[in-house]
């Protein structure tokens, strides 16, 4: 940043102009920033209150890529090296934007990133929008002290829309567990809004909870108080049978 108000004794600093932060695994920038050395929740808290963007260089490691399919990356090509985008053995970055961004060190080896307001996340075969999202990174105990680790969980809340190649998912909330390899979509607590997955191949699934499995083009639909789960299959093609079985055509 070009200017800022620094208070070393209080362990804080702030500024209204744009600030860039570069770490081992991410690059963040935004306006109207505030830094705290220590808070009740963690250490080295940085807040951007306007026009924020953060790029995670290691991304989600292809979590949303279907098996036996080509990568349909929605990454911003300007943020990655051209050769990297062509190599399947390289991870593509995950880029997130929001009105508000906050990140800090929490507990030991963990880092939390919170984004709120007009949130969008783009990555390898992934485009996600929602009102609020929280990312938790967990570092390997044997890793470098500078590293923030890898994405462990992702919690998206409010008007969640997840777009992948040939599939769109909608929910009130979504919880992604990278270690377990599953994403859980949930409807609203009052049951008025259900989770929904629309797939070009097998149709539409609706339920109180839908579970997506890493690398698989499948969904497990769970019903609840709002009713039984529902699956709408694509139209069945004409199989060639006559409308009236056994009816013979009359000769002219």
Positions of PLM-derived features:
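Mature-chain termini and adjacent capping regions
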Residues: 1-252
């Amino acid at each position: 940043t070009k200017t800022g108000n620094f208070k070393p004794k209080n362990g804080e600093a702030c500024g209204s102009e744009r600030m860039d932060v570069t770490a081992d695994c991410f690059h963040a920038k935004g306006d109207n920033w505030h830094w705290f050395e220590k808070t009740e929740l963690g250490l080295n808290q940085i807040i951007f209150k306007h026009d924020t963007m953060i790029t995670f260089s290691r991304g989600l490691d292809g979590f949303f890529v279907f098996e036996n399919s080509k990568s349909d990356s929605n990454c911003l090509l300007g943020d990655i090296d051209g050769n990297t985008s062509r190599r399947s053995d390289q991870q593509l970055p995950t880029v997130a934007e929001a009105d508000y961004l906050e990140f800090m060190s929490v507990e030991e080896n963990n880092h939390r990133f919170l984004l709120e307001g007009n949130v969008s996340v783009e990555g390898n075969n992934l485009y996600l929008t929602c009102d609020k999202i929280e990312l938790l990174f967990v570092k390997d105990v044997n890793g470098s002290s500078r590293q923030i680790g890898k994405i462990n969980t992702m919690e998206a809340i409010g008007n969640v829309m997840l777009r992948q190649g040939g599939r769109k998912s909608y929910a009130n909330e979504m919880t992604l567990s990278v270690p377990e390899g599953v994403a859980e979509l949930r409807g609203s607590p009052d049951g008025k809004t259900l989770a929904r997955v629309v797939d070009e191949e097998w149709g539409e699934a609706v339920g109180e909870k839908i579970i997506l499995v890493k690398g698989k083009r499948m969904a497990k639909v769970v019903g609840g108080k709002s009713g039984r789960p529902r699956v709408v299959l694509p139209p069945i093609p004409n199989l060639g049978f006559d409308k009236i079985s056994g009816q013979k055509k009359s000769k002219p």
